[in-house]
Each structure stands twice: as structure tokens, then as C-alpha cells.
Amino acid sequence: MTGVQTCALPISPPEHLIRFFPIAGTPVETLIGDTRRQVRRILDGSDDRLLVVIGPCSIHDPAAAMAYARQLLEQRHKYRDTLEIVMRVYFEKPRTTVGWKGLINDPYLDETFRIDEGLRIARQLLIDINRLGLPAGSEFLDVISPQYLGDLISWGAIGARTTESQVHRELASGLSAPIGFKNGTDGNIRIATDAIQAAAGGHHFLSVHKNGQVAIVQTNGNRNCHVILRGGKTPNYDAQNVAAACEQLTASKLPATLMVDCSHANSSKQHEKQLDVARSVADQIASGSNQVFGVMVESHLHAGAQKFTPGRDNAAALEYGKSITDACLGWEHSTQLLELLSRAVAQRNAG
């Protein structure tokens, strides 16, 4: 690039990392396949449980993530008849301007940007979480990292800032996991319904093969995609907004079911309000509604968030088990939320 200084450092191709951390023929592969099938059944209504994707806003400390996973596994077992619990394991953070972009981009929180190490740490952590018997869900922010990690994800999301991107719609069309598209940051549902329709079709596009070579990828389409309501200029989780969104889905000839994100604009960026969102969703479910098939929740061992700037702050001084990105519910409130949702599902299904 003329007049611009750039530097490109090659890293190992995806197949090298997959060979080093294999899952073929293991219980991890079985769990992921089974969970994907269960999520598809929840999507099509043949499983009447609620999908709950819950976990830290982002992963910055693998040890804390594993501690959280062990506690969440107990909740997964406890509510297995009413909830399909999947741990939120986000390694990449979209940024409106600048900031820490996640564990893959800067795994050591020191602006060394060891992306090769970030991919290795992420793959190891995903395997460790799945080995517990706890499936993982994540956001797909770029089109290369899924080649390194996609086989370990049971459910995926395309964020509000990328739902309208053709590249991400093409990516979703080739992923094996069910994928949720968030409404736009302004609350626009149409871009999400358009994305679902686009991802359902086959595409040809440039990407990277698992051997590291640039390739033309042909996909058959992913028909297991859905809308995630995350709020916009105002929250959109209440029964009236859910019904309006389902009308738009029906008008687009799509299934009239969706997921609600309890965080982000729906909680007005106030983590405690996630409980209020969950109560509203629980009331809708308890009244007999099947329109909301799942929820997303930002949760960690400890409530809130702590400020951290890579290159300026000391990572060793961070409080254990607390987010360094969006504020999260603490563990006690997280278990209350799960119990609330479980009771609502049980009440609906008993009726």
C-alpha cells in the first residue's frame, strides 16, 4: 500500500491447530453434534425447552472462564428438562471506535497482539469447556477464525454491527451451527430478516481453506438461522415488540419465533436490568407464548465490570472473575434468572 506502512506476520494454517487440538471421534464432537441438533429442534418447535446462552461478555481470563463453566454445568444439569443451557464464550469484541478487541486479538492484554497465541488459547479453552459436558456459543466477527474454531461451537451469533454485511451472511451460509442475527443498532429488524434469507441460500466467495490457501468456497446455505432482539434506540423485548417482530418474520415467510438478548440496548447497558428483561420474557412464556425460544444473558462470577486499558493498566491487578468489557450479572443473580426462566417454561408446558 503506497504511503502506508504495513507488516504481515504469517501464522500456522487452521489444520495445524486442529491437528494439535483434535476432537474427531471424541465425546466433545458428540456433545457439539447433539447440542446443535437440540437447538435445531428448539428452533422448529419440536423441543419445548428454552435455549439460554449465558456467560461473560468476553473472555479475558481462561482460568476464570473455566471456574464459571464448572458452576454453569451444575445449572445445566439442574434445569435440563426446561432449559438448554449453552455457555457464552466470546473471544472477539466489535468496537465502535477503538479498544481491546478480545482474547484472540490480544490474549496477554499487553498490546503484543499475539493472534497466533490467541487462537491456540481459544481452541484449548473451548475444548476444555466442552470436555466438561458444557456446550459453547460464540459470535463470529471475522471470516477466518471460524476455520480455527468453528467445529467447537454449538450455536453462533452475528452481531448488530455485522448483520448487514454480505461477507458475514455468506459466512453464516456455510456454518454448521445454528446462527442468530441481531437486529441493527437502531432497532431495525429488516436487516436481520434479510440476513436470514440470504444465509439460507448457497453462495460462492473467497475465503481461506483449512490448509491456509486462499480458496473459492461454495456453501449450500444454512436454514437454521434466526433473529435476536437486542434493542435499538429503545428496548424491544416486551410482548408488544416481540409480537411486532414476529409479524415481520411471518411477512418475510420465516418462522415467527425469535431470541431475546437481555443485555445491550434491552437493558439500557445496565447489567442489573437483565433480570427485568428476563422477567418480562418469563411472563410471556408462562402465559403460553412460544414466540421467544431463547435468551442471551451476560453473566460472570462477579457483578459489574472493571476498567482496563491494555498497555496502560496492569493485567495482574485485575479482579478475578469480573468483566473488562460490558458489565455482567453476578453469579447469584444469574442463578435467580435461570430459576425464573425454568419455572416459566415448566408452567407453560404444564398448561
Question: Where do the PLM segments sit?
Answer:
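Active-site-facing alpha/beta catalytic cores
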Residues: 82-237, 241-242, 264-265, 269, ...
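Internal helix-turn-beta structural module
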Residues: 301-347
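N-terminal glycine-rich anion-binding loops that anchor highly charged ligand groups
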Residues: 37-52
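Glycine-rich loop at the start of a catalytic domain that most often binds anionic cofactors/ligands
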Residues: 62-74, 97-104
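Conserved, mostly hydrophobic/aromatic
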Residues: 55, 260, 330
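Short, small-residue-biased leader/transition segments that mark boundaries at the very start
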Residues: 2-9
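Gly-rich Lys/Arg/Thr-decorated short loops/hinges at beta-loop-alpha junctions or inter-strand turns
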Residues: 14-23, 219-231, 318-319
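Conserved phosphate/anionic-ligand binding catalytic regions in large, soluble enzymes, centered on
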Residues: 51-64, 326
